[in-house]
Curated annotation (Swiss-Prot):
N-acetylalanine modifications at: 2
S-S bridge residues: 91-104, 94-102, 157-171
Residues listed as glycosylation sites in the UniProt record: 107, 180, 190, 294
Protein known as: Cell cycle control protein 50A
Keyword terms, alphabetized: Acetylation, Cell membrane, Cytoplasmic vesicle, Disulfide bond, Glycoprotein, Golgi apparatus, Lipid transport, Membrane, Transmembrane, Transmembrane helix, Transport
A GO term for molecular function: structural molecule activity
Gene this chain is encoded by: TMEM30A
Membrane-side (Cytoplasmic) residue stretches: 2-49, 347-361
Domain writeup: The N-terminal domain seems to play a role in the reaction cycle of the catalytic subunit such as ATP8A2.
Cellular compartment(s): Membrane; Cell membrane; Golgi apparatus; Cytoplasmic vesicle, Secretory vesicle membrane
Phenotype upon changing residue 132 to A: Decreases PS- and PE-dependent ATPase activity of ATP11C:TMEM30A
Cellular compartments per GO CC: apical plasma membrane; azurophil granule membrane; early endosome membrane; endoplasmic reticulum; Golgi apparatus; late endosome membrane; membrane; phospholipid-translocating ATPase complex
Length: 361
Protein backbone atom coordinates (compact mmCIF):
# COMPACT_ATOMS: atom_id res chain seq x y z
CA UNK A 1 0.00 0.00 0.00
CA UNK A 2 1.42 3.36 -0.98
CA UNK A 3 1.10 6.48 1.06
CA UNK A 4 1.90 10.11 0.48
CA UNK A 5 4.98 11.56 2.19
CA UNK A 6 5.24 15.22 2.92
CA UNK A 7 8.54 16.51 4.34
CA UNK A 8 6.71 19.38 5.96
CA UNK A 9 4.87 16.94 8.21
CA UNK A 10 8.06 15.56 9.81
CA UNK A 11 10.95 17.25 11.54
CA UNK A 12 13.99 15.02 12.23
CA UNK A 13 11.81 11.90 12.35
CA UNK A 14 9.42 13.32 14.95
CA UNK A 15 5.63 13.12 14.85
CA UNK A 16 3.63 15.78 13.02
CA UNK A 17 3.01 18.84 15.09
CA UNK A 18 -0.45 19.80 16.24
CA UNK A 19 -2.25 22.53 14.37
CA UNK A 20 -1.15 25.87 15.67
CA UNK A 21 1.69 24.31 17.72
CA UNK A 22 5.46 24.68 17.50
CA UNK A 23 7.40 21.92 15.75
CA UNK A 24 9.89 20.07 17.97
CA UNK A 25 13.35 19.80 16.53
CA UNK A 26 16.65 18.17 17.53
CA UNK A 27 18.63 20.37 15.23
CA UNK A 28 21.54 22.11 17.10
CA UNK A 29 21.44 25.85 17.45
CA UNK A 30 22.88 27.80 14.60
CA UNK A 31 25.96 28.95 16.51
CA UNK A 32 29.62 28.78 15.61
CA UNK A 33 30.33 26.39 18.49
CA UNK A 34 27.50 23.91 17.90
CA UNK A 35 27.85 24.02 14.13
CA UNK A 36 31.63 23.57 14.40
CA UNK A 37 32.47 26.79 12.63
CA UNK A 38 34.96 28.09 15.21
CA UNK A 39 38.17 29.47 13.74
CA UNK A 40 40.95 26.90 13.84
CA UNK A 41 44.59 26.65 12.92
CA UNK A 42 45.91 23.46 11.38
CA UNK A 43 49.64 23.43 10.69
CA UNK A 44 50.86 22.06 7.41
CA UNK A 45 53.54 19.51 8.21
CA UNK A 46 56.42 19.93 5.83
CA UNK A 47 60.05 18.94 5.99
CA UNK A 48 60.99 22.53 6.66
CA UNK A 49 58.85 22.68 9.81
CA UNK A 50 59.15 19.13 11.20
CA UNK A 51 62.86 18.38 10.79
CA UNK A 52 64.10 21.37 12.85
CA UNK A 53 61.89 20.22 15.74
CA UNK A 54 63.60 16.81 15.85
CA UNK A 55 67.05 18.38 15.74
CA UNK A 56 66.20 21.00 18.37
CA UNK A 57 64.88 18.32 20.76
CA UNK A 58 68.04 16.30 20.26
CA UNK A 59 70.35 19.29 20.74
CA UNK A 60 68.54 20.27 23.96
CA UNK A 61 68.00 16.87 25.56
CA UNK A 62 71.45 15.36 24.93
CA UNK A 63 73.46 18.10 26.75
CA UNK A 64 70.94 18.16 29.60
CA UNK A 65 71.17 14.37 29.92
CA UNK A 66 74.96 14.46 29.93
CA UNK A 67 74.95 17.15 32.62
CA UNK A 68 72.51 15.21 34.81
CA UNK A 69 74.42 11.95 34.32
CA UNK A 70 77.77 13.52 35.21
CA UNK A 71 76.25 15.26 38.23
CA UNK A 72 74.72 12.00 39.41
CA UNK A 73 78.04 10.17 39.08
CA UNK A 74 79.76 12.84 41.18
CA UNK A 75 77.47 12.06 44.11
CA UNK A 76 79.16 9.89 46.72
CA UNK A 77 77.10 6.94 47.90
CA UNK A 78 77.73 3.67 49.71
CA UNK A 79 75.32 0.91 50.74
CA UNK A 80 75.94 -1.52 53.59
CA UNK A 81 73.65 -4.56 53.74
CA UNK A 82 73.22 -5.82 57.28
CA UNK A 83 70.33 -8.27 56.87
CA UNK A 84 72.50 -11.07 58.22
CA UNK A 85 71.17 -13.98 56.16
CA UNK A 86 74.70 -14.97 55.13
CA UNK A 87 76.40 -17.22 57.71
CA UNK A 88 79.55 -15.08 57.56
CA UNK A 89 77.67 -11.86 58.35
CA UNK A 90 78.25 -10.34 61.82
CA UNK A 91 74.47 -9.88 62.09
CA UNK A 92 73.63 -13.52 61.35
CA UNK A 93 73.31 -14.25 65.06
CA UNK A 94 70.49 -11.69 65.27
CA UNK A 95 68.17 -13.80 63.11
CA UNK A 96 67.43 -16.00 66.10
CA UNK A 97 64.39 -14.82 68.07
CA UNK A 98 66.10 -15.93 71.29
CA UNK A 99 68.73 -13.17 71.03
CA UNK A 100 66.94 -10.02 72.24
CA UNK A 101 68.20 -7.38 72.08
CA UNK A 102 70.91 -8.18 69.56
CA UNK A 103 73.92 -6.02 68.70
CA UNK A 104 76.22 -6.43 65.72
CA UNK A 105 79.01 -4.40 64.14
CA UNK A 106 79.89 -4.18 60.45
CA UNK A 107 83.20 -2.68 59.36
CA UNK A 108 83.58 -0.97 56.00
CA UNK A 109 85.90 1.43 54.21
CA UNK A 110 85.24 4.72 52.44
CA UNK A 111 87.59 4.91 49.46
CA UNK A 112 86.85 8.61 48.90
CA UNK A 113 85.89 11.42 51.25
CA UNK A 114 82.29 12.62 51.48
CA UNK A 115 82.07 16.40 51.17
CA UNK A 116 79.18 18.60 52.29
CA UNK A 117 76.19 17.38 54.26
CA UNK A 118 75.84 13.60 54.31
CA UNK A 119 72.49 11.85 54.55
CA UNK A 120 72.08 8.49 56.28
CA UNK A 121 69.17 6.35 55.08
CA UNK A 122 67.83 2.95 55.99
CA UNK A 123 66.62 0.85 53.09
CA UNK A 124 64.17 -2.05 52.93
CA UNK A 125 63.49 -4.49 50.11
CA UNK A 126 60.46 -6.67 49.37
CA UNK A 127 58.33 -4.56 51.72
CA UNK A 128 55.06 -3.56 50.05
CA UNK A 129 53.97 -0.36 51.74
CA UNK A 130 51.76 0.36 48.73
CA UNK A 131 49.27 -2.41 49.55
CA UNK A 132 45.76 -0.95 49.54
CA UNK A 133 44.75 -2.14 53.01
CA UNK A 134 48.13 -1.20 54.45
CA UNK A 135 48.01 2.36 53.08
CA UNK A 136 44.50 2.92 54.50
CA UNK A 137 45.36 1.46 57.92
CA UNK A 138 45.79 4.74 59.80
CA UNK A 139 43.74 7.48 61.44
CA UNK A 140 44.83 10.92 60.30
CA UNK A 141 42.52 12.61 62.81
CA UNK A 142 44.21 10.75 65.64
CA UNK A 143 47.65 11.66 64.29
CA UNK A 144 46.56 15.30 64.12
CA UNK A 145 45.90 15.32 67.87
CA UNK A 146 42.12 14.96 67.87
CA UNK A 147 41.08 13.93 71.39
CA UNK A 148 38.00 11.96 70.33
CA UNK A 149 39.92 10.03 67.67
CA UNK A 150 42.65 9.29 70.21
CA UNK A 151 40.26 7.24 72.36
CA UNK A 152 38.04 6.05 69.50
CA UNK A 153 40.27 5.34 66.48
CA UNK A 154 38.95 4.82 62.97
CA UNK A 155 37.76 1.36 61.92
CA UNK A 156 40.30 1.55 59.09
CA UNK A 157 42.92 0.67 61.71
CA UNK A 158 41.55 -2.85 62.26
CA UNK A 159 42.96 -5.23 63.41
CA UNK A 160 45.38 -2.77 65.07
CA UNK A 161 42.67 -0.54 66.51
CA UNK A 162 42.46 -1.79 70.08
CA UNK A 163 44.57 -4.01 72.32
CA UNK A 164 43.88 -5.13 75.87
CA UNK A 165 40.54 -3.27 75.71
CA UNK A 166 42.37 0.01 75.15
CA UNK A 167 42.66 2.13 72.00
CA UNK A 168 46.04 1.91 70.29
CA UNK A 169 47.93 5.16 69.77
CA UNK A 170 49.01 5.40 67.04
CA UNK A 171 46.66 2.85 65.50
CA UNK A 172 46.93 0.97 62.22
CA UNK A 173 49.26 -1.38 60.39
CA UNK A 174 51.63 1.37 59.20
CA UNK A 175 52.45 2.52 62.72
CA UNK A 176 52.55 -1.05 64.03
CA UNK A 177 55.28 -1.99 61.54
CA UNK A 178 57.50 1.05 62.21
CA UNK A 179 61.22 0.53 61.60
CA UNK A 180 63.00 0.38 64.97
CA UNK A 181 66.62 -0.58 64.36
CA UNK A 182 69.20 1.75 65.92
CA UNK A 183 72.19 2.68 63.75
CA UNK A 184 75.41 4.28 65.02
CA UNK A 185 78.42 5.26 62.95
CA UNK A 186 82.05 5.35 64.13
CA UNK A 187 85.29 6.41 62.47
CA UNK A 188 88.17 4.07 63.26
CA UNK A 189 91.25 6.27 63.62
CA UNK A 190 94.90 5.36 63.32
CA UNK A 191 94.97 4.35 66.96
CA UNK A 192 92.01 2.01 66.27
CA UNK A 193 89.93 3.91 68.82
CA UNK A 194 86.44 4.46 67.37
CA UNK A 195 85.36 8.09 67.07
CA UNK A 196 81.55 8.52 67.11
CA UNK A 197 80.04 10.43 64.19
CA UNK A 198 77.43 13.00 65.25
CA UNK A 199 74.05 12.01 63.80
CA UNK A 200 71.31 14.65 63.78
CA UNK A 201 67.83 13.21 64.21
CA UNK A 202 65.83 16.43 63.76
CA UNK A 203 65.18 18.00 60.39
CA UNK A 204 64.61 14.69 58.57
CA UNK A 205 60.83 15.07 58.12
CA UNK A 206 58.91 17.31 55.76
CA UNK A 207 58.00 20.67 57.28
CA UNK A 208 54.31 20.27 56.41
CA UNK A 209 54.19 16.86 58.09
CA UNK A 210 55.95 18.06 61.22
CA UNK A 211 53.94 21.26 61.67
CA UNK A 212 50.58 20.55 60.03
CA UNK A 213 49.68 16.87 59.67
CA UNK A 214 51.10 15.50 62.94
CA UNK A 215 50.31 16.96 66.36
CA UNK A 216 50.21 15.66 69.89
CA UNK A 217 46.91 15.65 71.80
CA UNK A 218 46.18 18.90 73.66
CA UNK A 219 46.89 19.11 77.36
CA UNK A 220 49.56 19.98 79.88
CA UNK A 221 53.31 19.53 79.81
CA UNK A 222 53.11 15.85 80.80
CA UNK A 223 52.90 13.99 77.49
CA UNK A 224 52.22 10.67 79.19
CA UNK A 225 49.14 12.18 80.80
CA UNK A 226 47.86 13.32 77.40
CA UNK A 227 47.99 9.74 76.12
CA UNK A 228 46.30 8.36 79.23
CA UNK A 229 43.82 5.60 78.44
CA UNK A 230 45.70 4.38 75.35
CA UNK A 231 48.18 1.58 74.77
CA UNK A 232 51.18 1.15 72.51
CA UNK A 233 51.06 -0.67 69.14
CA UNK A 234 51.43 -4.43 69.40
CA UNK A 235 54.92 -4.63 67.89
CA UNK A 236 56.37 -1.57 69.63
CA UNK A 237 58.85 -1.91 72.46
CA UNK A 238 57.70 1.31 74.17
CA UNK A 239 54.73 3.70 74.00
CA UNK A 240 54.63 6.68 71.67
CA UNK A 241 55.26 9.20 74.46
CA UNK A 242 58.65 7.58 75.16
CA UNK A 243 60.11 7.75 71.65
CA UNK A 244 62.50 10.59 72.55
CA UNK A 245 63.63 12.55 75.58
CA UNK A 246 63.32 15.78 73.59
CA UNK A 247 59.76 17.11 74.05
CA UNK A 248 59.91 18.71 70.59
CA UNK A 249 60.62 15.31 69.04
CA UNK A 250 58.36 13.05 71.05
CA UNK A 251 54.94 11.52 70.59
CA UNK A 252 53.19 11.95 67.27
CA UNK A 253 55.69 14.66 66.25
CA UNK A 254 58.67 12.30 66.50
CA UNK A 255 60.43 12.69 63.17
CA UNK A 256 61.44 9.03 62.82
CA UNK A 257 57.77 8.16 63.20
CA UNK A 258 56.66 10.87 60.75
CA UNK A 259 59.16 9.69 58.12
CA UNK A 260 57.93 6.11 58.44
CA UNK A 261 54.27 7.12 58.12
CA UNK A 262 54.92 8.56 54.64
CA UNK A 263 54.46 5.29 52.74
CA UNK A 264 56.65 4.30 49.79
CA UNK A 265 55.30 3.54 46.32
CA UNK A 266 57.67 0.67 45.50
CA UNK A 267 58.69 -2.47 47.44
CA UNK A 268 62.35 -1.42 47.49
CA UNK A 269 62.75 1.96 49.13
CA UNK A 270 64.86 4.07 51.43
CA UNK A 271 63.88 6.53 54.15
CA UNK A 272 65.95 9.29 55.70
CA UNK A 273 67.31 8.23 59.09
CA UNK A 274 69.87 10.85 60.16
CA UNK A 275 71.78 13.93 58.98
CA UNK A 276 75.55 14.34 59.20
CA UNK A 277 76.20 18.06 58.96
CA UNK A 278 79.41 19.55 57.65
CA UNK A 279 81.23 21.41 60.41
CA UNK A 280 84.18 22.87 58.53
CA UNK A 281 84.91 23.85 54.94
CA UNK A 282 88.52 22.82 55.46
CA UNK A 283 87.78 19.20 56.31
CA UNK A 284 85.49 16.64 54.67
CA UNK A 285 82.39 15.57 56.54
CA UNK A 286 83.37 11.91 56.30
CA UNK A 287 87.06 11.51 55.46
CA UNK A 288 88.23 8.45 53.59
CA UNK A 289 89.12 5.64 55.94
CA UNK A 290 87.75 2.78 58.00
CA UNK A 291 84.35 2.96 59.66
CA UNK A 292 82.15 0.72 61.75
CA UNK A 293 78.36 0.53 61.78
CA UNK A 294 76.91 -0.50 65.13
CA UNK A 295 73.42 -1.95 64.80
CA UNK A 296 70.83 -2.63 67.46
CA UNK A 297 68.99 -5.32 65.52
CA UNK A 298 65.26 -5.17 66.30
CA UNK A 299 63.50 -5.23 62.94
CA UNK A 300 63.05 -8.73 61.43
CA UNK A 301 62.82 -8.89 57.63
CA UNK A 302 63.91 -12.46 56.83
CA UNK A 303 60.37 -13.72 57.51
CA UNK A 304 59.21 -12.14 54.23
CA UNK A 305 62.54 -12.54 52.37
CA UNK A 306 63.32 -8.87 52.82
CA UNK A 307 66.66 -7.10 53.01
CA UNK A 308 67.95 -4.24 55.19
CA UNK A 309 70.69 -1.80 54.35
CA UNK A 310 72.24 1.44 55.51
CA UNK A 311 73.02 4.09 52.90
CA UNK A 312 75.34 7.08 53.16
CA UNK A 313 74.92 9.64 50.40
CA UNK A 314 75.66 13.21 49.47
CA UNK A 315 73.30 15.27 47.31
CA UNK A 316 73.52 17.79 44.48
CA UNK A 317 71.23 20.39 42.93
CA UNK A 318 69.20 17.55 41.39
CA UNK A 319 68.83 15.55 44.62
CA UNK A 320 70.29 12.13 45.29
CA UNK A 321 72.03 9.70 42.99
CA UNK A 322 69.79 8.89 40.01
CA UNK A 323 71.64 7.89 36.81
CA UNK A 324 68.39 6.79 35.12
CA UNK A 325 67.18 10.37 34.61
CA UNK A 326 70.33 11.36 32.72
CA UNK A 327 70.24 8.17 30.64
CA UNK A 328 66.58 8.82 29.78
CA UNK A 329 67.34 12.36 28.57
CA UNK A 330 70.27 11.14 26.47
CA UNK A 331 68.19 8.31 24.97
CA UNK A 332 65.26 10.57 24.03
CA UNK A 333 67.58 13.21 22.57
CA UNK A 334 69.56 10.63 20.59
CA UNK A 335 66.43 8.98 19.18
CA UNK A 336 65.00 12.36 18.20
CA UNK A 337 68.23 13.44 16.53
CA UNK A 338 68.53 10.10 14.70
CA UNK A 339 64.95 10.35 13.44
CA UNK A 340 65.73 13.84 12.20
CA UNK A 341 68.70 12.53 10.21
CA UNK A 342 66.65 9.66 8.74
CA UNK A 343 63.79 11.95 7.73
CA UNK A 344 66.27 14.43 6.26
CA UNK A 345 67.76 11.70 4.05
CA UNK A 346 64.30 10.54 2.96
CA UNK A 347 63.24 14.09 2.18
CA UNK A 348 66.41 14.73 0.19
CA UNK A 349 65.91 11.53 -1.81
CA UNK A 350 62.30 12.15 -2.81
CA UNK A 351 62.64 15.89 -3.27
CA UNK A 352 65.17 15.37 -6.06
CA UNK A 353 63.28 12.42 -7.55
CA UNK A 354 61.26 12.98 -10.69
CA UNK A 355 58.92 10.13 -9.79
CA UNK A 356 56.48 11.89 -7.51
CA UNK A 357 54.21 8.84 -7.48
CA UNK A 358 56.42 7.32 -4.77
CA UNK A 359 55.48 10.07 -2.34
CA UNK A 360 52.49 9.33 -0.15
CA UNK A 361 50.93 11.99 2.02
Amino acid sequence: MAMNYNAKDEVDGGPPCAPGGTAKTRRPDNTAFKQQRLPAWQPILTAGTVLPIFFIIGLIFIPIGIGIFVTSNNIREIEIDYTGTEPSSPCNKCLSPDVTPCFCTINFTLEKSFEGNVFMYYGLSNFYQNHRRYVKSRDDSQLNGDSSALLNPSKECEPYRRNEDKPIAPCGAIANSMFNDTLELFLIGNDSYPIPIALKKKGIAWWTDKNVKFRNPPGGDNLEERFKGTTKPVNWLKPVYMLDSDPDNNGFINEDFIVWMRTAALPTFRKLYRLIERKSDLHPTLPAGRYSLNVTYNYPVHYFDGRKRMILSTISWMGGKNPFLGIAYIAVGSISFLLGVVLLVINHKYRNSSNTADITI
